[in-house]
Amino acid sequence: MTGQPLLGDLLTLASDALPEVEALFETARSALKERVTTDGKVSSKALEEEQFAAHALSWLATYVESLRQMRAWAGRLETEGRFGEMEALILQIAFGEYLAQIRGGIPMSQTETARVQDIGIELGHPGEAVRRLIQAGNTPAARARLVALMRDNHGRATFGASGLDEELEMIRDQFRRFADERVAPHAHGWHMRDELIPMEIVEALAEMGVFGLTIPEEFGGFGLSKASMVVVSEELSRGYIGVGSLGTRSEIAAELILCGGTDAQKAAWLPKLASGEILPTAVFTEPNTGSDLGSLRTRAVKDGDEWVVHGNKTWITHAARTHVMTLLARTDLETTDYRGLSMFLAEKVPGTDADPFPTPGMTGGEIEVLGYRGMKEYEIGFDGFRVKAENLLGGVEGQGFKQLMQTFESARIQTAARAIGVAQNALEVGMQYAEERKQFGKALIEFPRVAGKLAMMAVEIMVARQLTYHSAWEKDHGQRCDLEAGMAKLLGARVAWAAADNALQIHGGNGFALEYQISRILCDARILNIFEGAAEIQAQVIARRLLD
């Protein structure tokens, strides 16, 4: 291992490299847009035929935005006098690696690599800043020095300053302690026994304000920022993704009601959601529809002052012991697309293990799953299930899909935050094992490839963090952020899976044993590329947004 680990003019190099990759992205976007445009509009058929190129563009855009946010993060820290050696190494390795991948190939999955040639453009010679960062950014010396600093900073919530303000870091500390004391010691047992998260944990979260975190104070919540929601989700998911996901249900339900509910619905439902008095579940997906929500077939027919629901739903998280369903159903039976869908706040009686669905008109059964346990997944059948007419969201039919889309930004930001928490957990577990496990007379962490895995985990977690924090900042400031939130979710899910897989690899054969918690973390990480929009769907949505 030779050479100095840290480049002397790093911030200047990073600034100088950005215009080159931004120009590359614009060239790629123009080239693809020309191929998929018919009569002045982007053709859905042509875009599908060019799907690989379109998704390559999405990943290229995600990398460019990630580097942009990393440079902005470094600049803020530099101004505040907090840009130290660890932060500099993280920035340098991130730029070195991501620039190399932009020019050589970005992994979309284990067997799919996105290259700019797929989009139909040729690469020229790199500029001096890009060349230097690729050549000397992500080096063995840089990775080794970063891991040495990480070992000197055991117990820190993040490796490298997060860039968040003191108030948000205080929130992080509070929930980190809770996760360490009340969640992490029991998470593996809950997973292995496939148990629901105990109600005392749910009640403790309610007392801490998790379910009303972003609900306005006038409705009984704390009125905090989406950034605070991100930090809370990160830390709880670091303890156990199931616990970190409990707040997601309330976040989605509250956002639906805030954006689309009547004044009476807001007054009736939001205080109870904020306090945790009622627990909600999202009931959208149907068998054979997956992400194609516009083709839902569950129907609701008006009968006096009630709606009568018939149909089937699947992959419903935390369905049994909740009190209300945000239920998407077709009220205009003449339609076959999203225009005939309506959203309901459908009340139900919480179930038990012995009788999960006691409400008349409802039946259901558990779907056994690989990971992401703790709330359980269910199939539900509706046969004459009744909903009060006053519980039609907004009091207007046909607005369900539009109302749901208004929640997508927050949902994707929250999912990205959960991914960061899972990745951070994998890093901490992998690093602890690498320091404690001895082979050939020394700790595993002393071997360069093991240390290198840990270094790249820390770097990519910070990249995902900055992209997610930026999305939350945009949301908090009233800016449209569906594109950035989608990118954060797309990248965060890949980072979590890579971190879990590499941490398990560090464990060797022990990682394959169920008794080691990394086996659970791997299973939990796998869902992040699937739910809330599979990676392929997410890339398609991003591409469409970039090209429109």
Swiss-Prot record:
Tell me which domain of life the UniProt entry assigns to the organism this sequence originates from. Bacteria
The record ties this protein, via PROSITE patterns, to:
ACYL_COA_DH_2 (PS00073)
- The Enzyme Commission number assigned here is 1.3.8.12
* Residues that, per the record, bind FAD: 282-291, 315-317, 437, 505-509, 534-536
**Catalysed reactions, semicolon-separated:** (2S)-methylsuccinyl-CoA + oxidized [electron-transfer flavoprotein] + H(+) = 2-methylfumaryl-CoA + reduced [electron-transfer flavoprotein]
- Give the multimer and partner information: Homodimer.
| PANTHER family for this protein | ACYL-COA DEHYDROGENASE, ACYL-COA DEHYDROGENASE YDBM-RELATED
Question: What is this protein identified as?
Answer: (2S)-methylsuccinyl-CoA dehydrogenase
Source species, please?
Cereibacter sphaeroides (Rhodobacter sphaeroides)
